[in-house]
């Protein structure tokens, strides 16, 4: 899958999640590539693009180990429940070394999950992960 198609699928997923949750679930979505000690921002939607890049390692917080370990499979995702502010709430593996970062810059995942509508809002997210399992993102050199 191309980055262009991936970003369209991500935007559609975000729209579905927000509709089911009746408010914005994640106000920040980023597709990144990690290789060795280098990272590249491939796509971004949110309120703080330059700060996202500048503060990436700090904001990765509790998710940093999972992101950098490199042992997750395509389609796998991880959440942290107690990250607040600009700390990332989730990541999903889109392809080899390619990740989706999801963040709510206002609420923690714990606060989001307390709303009963969160259960239904998760469905599009899981469906998105299945799409990447079937067709991972492949970066063109």
Segments predicted by a language model, with ranges:
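Short N-terminal helix-loop-first-beta-strand/juxtamembrane motif that initiates sensory/input modules
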Residues: 19-39
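A charged amphipathic helix-loop-strand protein-protein interaction module that recurs
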Residues: 3-16, 42-87
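Sensory/regulatory domains in signal-transduction proteins
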Residues: 70-117
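Juxtadomain coupling helices with adjacent low-complexity linkers
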Residues: 106-141
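Generic non-transmembrane alpha-helical segments
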Residues: 9-20, 24, 119-124, 128
């Amino acid at each position: 899958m191309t980055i262009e198609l991936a970003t369209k699928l991500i935007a559609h997923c975000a729209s579905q999640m927000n509709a089911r949750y009746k408010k914005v679930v994640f106000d920040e979505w980023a597709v990144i590539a990690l290789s060795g000690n280098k990272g590249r921002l491939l796509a971004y939607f949110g309120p703080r693009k330059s700060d996202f890049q500048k503060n990436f390692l700090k904001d990765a917080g509790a998710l940093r180990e999972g992101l950098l370990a490199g042992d997750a499979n395509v389609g796998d995702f991880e959440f942290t429940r107690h990250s607040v502010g600009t700390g990332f709430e989730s990541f999903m593996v889109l392809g080899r070394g390619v990740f989706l970062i999801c963040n709510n810059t206002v609420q923690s995942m714990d606060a989001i999950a307390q709303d009963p509508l969160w259960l239904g809002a998760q469905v599009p997210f899981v469906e998105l992960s299945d799409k990447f399992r079937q067709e991972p993102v492949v970066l063109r050199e």
